[in-house]
Amino acid sequence: MIGALKVIREYKTYEKGEEIIFATQRGYGDLKGGWEFPGGKIEEGETSQAALQREIMEELDTEISVGELIDTIEYDYPTFHLSMDCFWSEIIKGDLVLKEHEAAKWLTKEKMDSVEWLPADITIVGKIKEALR
């Protein structure tokens, strides 16, 4: 299975000027309830970047621009292997409407460990924390 994961790095700031990251709580399947960065599967003929844009529009009714690749994560779950390309992304327009997720949060670097991440996302969380101001 090829997966595309995008990380929304929104440049909204708090009073302190901290960058914040958008995370969602999975609302379906065996991994329901775990926290992840929104994204989804690549369809035949799609690039990872195009898949991210499509998935975010479908799942969150939001248009994004896809930026730099953070990393490609390989993870073996008990029933499948996940390969996911992780990108920095920014919102172009939309209000991040939750269509498939149970909940969502904007997280600062300090709050990244406040949710229970899905196993495949834990590695990328560390890389994101290193990159944030």
What residue spans do the PLM features occupy?
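Conserved N-terminal beta-strand and adjoining loop/helix that marks the start
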Residues: 1-21
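Active-site-adjacent beta-strand/loop module that shapes the phosphate/pyrophosphate-binding cleft
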Residues: 10, 63-65, 72-95, 103-105, ...
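Conserved Nudix-box catalytic region and its N-terminal flanking loop in Nudix hydrolases
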Residues: 19-58
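A generic structural signal for short beta-strands and their flanking turns/coil linkers
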Residues: 20, 31-33, 38, 62-65, ...
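Nudix hydrolase/Nudix homology domain
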Residues: 30, 97-133
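Structural detector for helix-capping/boundary residues
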Residues: 40, 54-55, 67, 102, ...
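Hydrophobic packing within well-folded, soluble alpha/beta domains
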Residues: 48, 52-57, 69, 87, ...
